[in-house]
């Protein structure tokens, strides 16, 4: 599906800190989800500002390991339902009216998952089941219950720059004629 719903928002103030569940959050270009330590990490631009996981994937992993662990223990920022997260970098997701995220890569399950339940790391490994990492393209406010949808494929930053330069050059040439 190309449209879903945001079921959960979580953040953690520092590495290994407990996840804090939120009803709504501000999302910024500089810091991802405000108050989340990972979103504020540097790296121009930081490609893991926000992490997302599908409810169906988390439920499938739980069934595989025979446990029922709350989704936020995955340490993802956003839980989505009814949307197949894109498994390719560069795809953009709109949440609510304003926020746009760009998928940067798969979220690789770490050893912490194995500490939660034996076999969980392996259960989260196939087909991006562990979720997706994203960077913020456009900030704003999100809330549980917001729609989340895949945007039409946008050109990359370099493609936009080339298009703009071509347009500007042709516009300038036309103006001189």
Description of each model-found segment:
Residues 1-177:
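Metal-cofactor-dependent catalytic cores
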